[in-house]
Amino acid sequence: MSVGVAVLGSGNIGTDLMIKVLRLSDSLRMVAMAGIDSGSDGLARARRLGVTTTADGVAGLVTLPEFADVELVFDATSAGAHRHHDSVLRAYGRIVVDLTPAAIGPYVVPPVNLDEHLAETNVNMVTCGGQATVPIVAAIGRVTPVAYGEIVASIASKSAGPGTRANIDEFTETTARAIEVVGGADRGKAIIVLNPADPPLLMRDTVYCLCPDTDADRSAIIAAVTDMVGAVQEYVPGYRLKQEVQFDRVDSYLPALGGHLTGLQVSVFLEVSGAGHYLPEYAGNLDIMTSAALRTAERLIGRRAVTA
């Protein structure tokens, strides 16, 4: 039996997520979409697909008769708005999957730590860059300690809507923190690049990990990274290694660490293409977020069905 869900936010991410629920999920049933722009393409598309809509945001959502059938809400708005949404939805006892950088609930990256947070009522999906790169940092960390993890996420400017642009600072802060908390690095740093190239380029992510152990098993690191890429591909088919994993010796002062490091730099280069459910293939940054959110919601609901 499927469980009713709603989407807050009628922008790029919210609309792509709605379509994924409708097309791909056997356990989730799309009940309602709430936005604040009555003329948005997302709300118009939802209405055409038979989904109940409101342009009055979370206040409108909770007053819909259909809200009684909603057990889980995806929040695809902004970090600032999510703080209010969480307080409202918490009062109604709804599970919340947060696709903003607000991070009220714990960070969740499905192949790394989802199993640890199946009992939570609010989970945070980090950022698109976090979903693409934190699994790699975690994979390397399973073989050898990571003193410093730095990621650079390059996304097509055309795929970045107003919500993404408004959250740039939160993006870098949340992603860097997730590199540490979920990825296991002692220190983390994140950089986002909005690439204006036309035609738009696919999402590219570069992961640099500095490891104190110069003699770390390189074959084991490659195997761990390859296995993790396969785990992400289970729900994001367009996620792939762009080049072979690269290794370089490091023996220098590193300002990010505030000291000297002798060790190994591991460099991983990734590419993410989207499934094209709502936006074109180049919007892999949206696809990895919505796909991770869908996977997380299905597991959260599945866990509750088992324990009910």
UniProtKB/Swiss-Prot annotation:
GO BP, one annotated term: catabolic process
Its EC number(s): 1.2.1.10
Molecular-function GO term, any one: acetaldehyde dehydrogenase (acetylating) activity
Keywords: Aromatic hydrocarbons catabolism, NAD, Oxidoreductase
Active site: 128 (acyl-thioester intermediate)
The keyword Oxidoreductase is assigned to this record: yes
Keyword Translocase on entry: no
Residues where NAD(+) binds: 10-13, 159-167, 285
Pfam family, one: Semialdhyde_dh
Catalytic activity: acetaldehyde + NAD(+) + CoA = acetyl-CoA + NADH + H(+)
EC class of the enzyme, as a word: oxidoreductase
Similarity comment: Belongs to the acetaldehyde dehydrogenase family.
Protein name: Acetaldehyde dehydrogenase 1
Organism, as annotated: Salinispora arenicola (strain CNS-205)
